[in-house]
Amino acid sequence: MTSPGTDAVSAACFERARARIPGGVNSPVRAFRAVGGTPRFIQSGAGPYLVDVDGNRYVDLVCSWGPLILGHAHPAVVAAVKQAAERGTSFGAPTEAEIEMAEEIARRVPAVEMIRLVNSGTEATMSALRLARAYTNRPLVVKFAGCYHGHVDALLSAAGSGVATLGLPGTPGVTPGQAAETIVLPYNDIDAVRTAFERYGGEIACVIVEAAAANMGVVPPEPGFNRALADIAHENGALLVLDEVLTGFRVSSAGWWGRDPVAADLFTFGKVIGGGLPIGAFGGRRDIMQLLAPAGTVYQAGTLSGNPVAVAAGLATLRESTPDIYARLDHVAAVLARALRDEFGRIGLPHQVQQAGNLFSVFFTTEPVRNYAQATGQEAWRYPPFFHALLDRGVHPPPSVYEAWFVSAAHDDAAVNQILDALPAAVRAAADARPPG
């Protein structure tokens, strides 16, 4: 392994990939379009580190976009995956491990009385919307600009994550009818929610919101915002769906619910509960969940739902995630966020470093960011040189200013110090940047 140097093999892989894979990647943000340069093709990961196909090693601040709270290739997770795979990779039949996962989630989040396992966070939110519409017999959904809930057609309007990264208002292929059934409101604006319910209340099936927004950069909910959403929805016969795909079991042992226990009607999960393998889940009130087939008439199914290898990886991750693990996650995030603030402050560059638990991100702006308009109004052109200065020094942050930074409990002092050593040059690169054109 070497310090970051050549990217020749990654460049060759990228060229080869573009011949057969649209854009050369299987998820848009991976293509480095927002930061420029060659995306790094990864060969392996261990603890807090990634190694690319050129042999360069990086401290990882992406962590597979959130699932890897224990770090890469944690021995307990690897052993669980190996043991499960040796028993069979898929059965198309129920397993006891699925029950254990459902029980573990319900134990951690008591508001989740029943749960259904699926294959991705997108599938979880898609299914939760179908269930909410069936339960209420209403068509409309309220979402918030900048919140990302996967690539569900009805939820891609003014979405965060890759949609924000690519500067898209939405996406072709979403029909006007689907878009018309989605009411998009400013995040953290409870008055806008009240106004929407005054106008459309009898037609709104649910409000869906990230438990803490982290796909337009990290924008935590204002105190009481999620609770007010629940109150307004319930006053009008609608449901609240809390999307914990990203925050679930990362920001605490009970996810965001552990920090702000708002009893939503439905929750969605993913990422951590798969330990790095594909999985998702949605759950909530028993009377709502029992509408799902075969108990009820709302159809939802999946060939690989509850996959035994993914469930094994997720259970191992959850069982290894002791209070000390969460304390380490919080400590590392706090150290890095403080260092970013100090370095930006020392150089006098306008900035906001915002946190939601151990999630954090940088905004190049003078005022705290509360919503999507403010997030997209920042000097985002400062991020590419900032990113590449870190990458050149062996630190791999997210390749978009609109994504959260993720740490793991495997980020030891050596890894943290490598990040701290890289920050001065990165902040200087951001300060020296000039707007395009």
Swiss-Prot record:
It comes from the Bacteria. InterPro entries: 4pyrrol_synth_GluAld_NH2Trfase, Aminotrans_3, Aminotrans_3_PPA_site, PyrdxlP-dep_Trfase, PyrdxlP-dep_Trfase_major, PyrdxlP-dep_Trfase_small. The modification N6-(pyridoxal phosphate)lysine is found at K271. Its EC number is 5.4.3.8. Its main location: cytoplasm. Its cofactor is pyridoxal 5'-phosphate. Disulfide bonds: none annotated. It holds the Pfam family Aminotran_3. One of its GO terms (molecular function) is pyridoxal phosphate binding. One of its GO terms (biological process) is protoporphyrinogen IX biosynthetic process. PANTHER family: GLUTAMATE-1-SEMIALDEHYDE 2,1-AMINOMUTASE, GLUTAMATE-1-SEMIALDEHYDE 2,1-AMINOMUTASE 1, CHLOROPLASTIC-RELATED. Belongs to the class-III pyridoxal-phosphate-dependent aminotransferase family. HemL subfamily. HAMAP family: HemL_aminotrans_3. This is Glutamate-1-semialdehyde 2,1-aminomutase. It comes from Acidothermus cellulolyticus (strain ATCC 43068 / DSM 8971 / 11B).
